[in-house]
Structure formats: structure tokens, C-alpha cells
Amino acid sequence: DGFRVDVIWHLIKDESFSDNPPNPEWHEGIDPYRAIVPLHTTDRPEVHQIIASMRRVVDSYSERVLIGEIYLSIERLVQYYRVNLSAVHLPFNFQLLLAQWDARHIARLIVEYEKALPEGGWANWVLGNHDRSRIASRVGRAQARVAAMLLLTLRGTPTLYYGDEIGMQDVPIPTER
């Protein structure tokens, strides 16, 4: 039991509500969210105080977990474990979800993540979620089976998006639904 907090790294904005600067690399055809550099609205230092207070509440109950959805580089992601592990128990590790599907690249990501984990930090791996195309749509059904085997044999907690275990692929959803 516990809580998964969506976009936990977005909880704090800078106090003057400054506009984010335009992304000079953005152009038509790229996700509109990427049109700005979220300098003032994500990964703010103050967010760690909020998360620490959430962690204290969760830790006041036995056997509970606090999970944070955090799309950041490994270097920034591991900061969400914090000193003395005072933040989320599991800052979702989306490296496999975002990686190009190449064995050497994935092997480097695994090693980099494991090396970056703070002492006592528990590894976790995510292959799919509601924000991205399903693994079978991204790499094909045969490779999705390989991906599931990788996910379930890596050290740490695996997160399997419902339907990925049967090779479910993306399908269009009619607007009337």
C-alpha cells in the first residue's frame, strides 16, 4: 500500500511565477510541451521539503511506499532519494521507457543508474506507462517479451504497465469513448 504521486517534481514553481524561456531547439512537429525550457516550473530545490513531509506521513504507517513520477536524467533522479533516504522510496526510473532499444545503450544505462544510486537506495525499473506508447508498439511483440524478461530480472522493483504482460499494443480510442 502507499501512494504514487504524479509529476512530483512539478509540485513547486518559483515564487515569482516567472515565465519559462522558449526552447531554441523546438520546432513544429515536436511535442508542444517541449516548446519551453521548464526552468522555473520543475525540479525546484524547494520541492524536496514538500516530499520530505510526505515521506514522514507515509513512514508513520507500517509497510507503506511513496512513489514519485519523475522524468529526469539519472543524475537528477537519484537526488529524489535524498540524504538519509528522506524523500520518495521509489523515484520512478524511466530510463528503459525512454531509451533507444539497443543492447549496448541499455547496458550503459543500467550500469550508470546502479552506480548513481545512493547507499540504501532501492533500484526500480519502468518499461511502460500511460504517458508513452506501449513497449510492444515501440519495439515489436518479440522484443517486448525480451524487454519483459529484462525488466523482471533486473535488481530492484519492476513496474509493469497493465496489458504489457500480454503484448498489448497501442490502439486508437474513438473520441466518443
Where are these regions (language model features)?
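Active-site and adjacent substrate-binding regions of carbohydrate-active enzymes
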Residues: 1-177
